[in-house]
Amino acid sequence: MLSSSFERNLHQPLLFIDKDTKVVIQGIGNQGQFHSRLMRQYGTKVVGAVHPKKAGSIIAGLPIFKNMKEVVKRTDANASLIFVPAPGAAAACIEAAQAGMGLVVCITEHIPQHDMIKVKKVMKETGCQLIGPNCPGLIQPGTHTKLGIIPTNIFNNGKIGIVSRSGTLTYEAAYATTLAGLGQSTVVGIGGDPFAGQLHTDVVKRFAADPQTEGIILIGEIGGTSEEDAAEWIAKTKLTQEKPVVAFIAGATAPPGKRMGHAGAIVSGGKGTAEGKYKALEAAGVRIARHPGNMGKFIFEEMKRMGKI
């Protein structure tokens, strides 16, 4: 399990966000304006946005600042949500991290992989936590806080932590756990790009340390080793003896070499297969759902079996 220093060292809440998270929008175009309104309607503290050419104005009810350093100085923002188009998104991530953000959530798709290598390096140097890119963001129903494009009406405060590479399957799992009366503690969409910030293990560790999270749904897809790495950590810590974990892997029918949606969803050289991931997770004590419609049913059964409901 994780020590309390895990939270303190990152200068942020254990589950990335809480009711006091102050968010700044980078990329206040049509999408940035639309989703910033929805976030505020939900209850998120969105304190401003950055646009170098429109500093001093008000857009979508938000004060506009010249750069990230200025918005941090003026608002004490500690999290950034990025809608900047792909050519400038990496620079926006780096600017946010170097301005002192504890969390950066990048929605942008099609960021060049070479750019993301630079971003990952800066994130490591600054201690900033990156979620994404190419992700729906994250949501915490209990504090009415969300960063991203996740629809809020299917979520309800509760016991299940969800970590997913797929946006739509995130919503499937959330709706199922809401219908089952379990609800969600925090839901994190980590994105499907090859060079993502947070991976499954990073989020599962936080769920393991969080007292509100009593069960976990892990949603993966073909390609990469994020799911296998999570399975190794789950097995090492014997997590499933304390908290049930249910997993679904998308792309089981994908032919080798065929990309399935996300840039990272590709089986190459015999690695990253759905079966390989299922095998690793099952060996770690994770219950496998081979159909997304079973995720809610299986986590309910596991929670009941362990006396958590």
Swiss-Prot record:
Enzyme Commission (EC) number: 6.2.1.5
Root EC class: ligase
Species, as recorded: Trichomonas vaginalis
Record-annotated disulphide pairs: none
Subcellular location: Hydrogenosome lumen
Gene name of this polypeptide: ALPHA-SCS3
The reaction(s) this protein catalyses: GTP + succinate + CoA = succinyl-CoA + GDP + phosphate; succinate + ATP + CoA = succinyl-CoA + ADP + phosphate
UniProt keyword Methyltransferase present: no
Name used for this protein in its record: Succinate--CoA ligase [ADP-forming] subunit alpha-3, mitochondrial
Chief place of localization: other
Family of the protein in this entry: Belongs to the succinate/malate CoA ligase alpha subunit family.
GO CC annotations, alphabetized: hydrogenosome lumen; mitochondrion; succinate-CoA ligase complex (ADP-forming)
Pfam families per UniProt: CoA_binding, Ligase_CoA
Subunit structure: Heterodimer of an alpha and a beta subunit.
Pathway(s): Carbohydrate metabolism; tricarboxylic acid cycle; succinate from succinyl-CoA (ligase route): step 1/1
InterPro entries given in the database record: Cit_synth/succinyl-CoA_lig_AS, Citrt_syn/SCS-alpha_CS, CoA-bd, CoA_lig_alpha, NAD(P)-bd_dom_sf, SUCC_ACL_C, Succinyl-CoA_synth-like
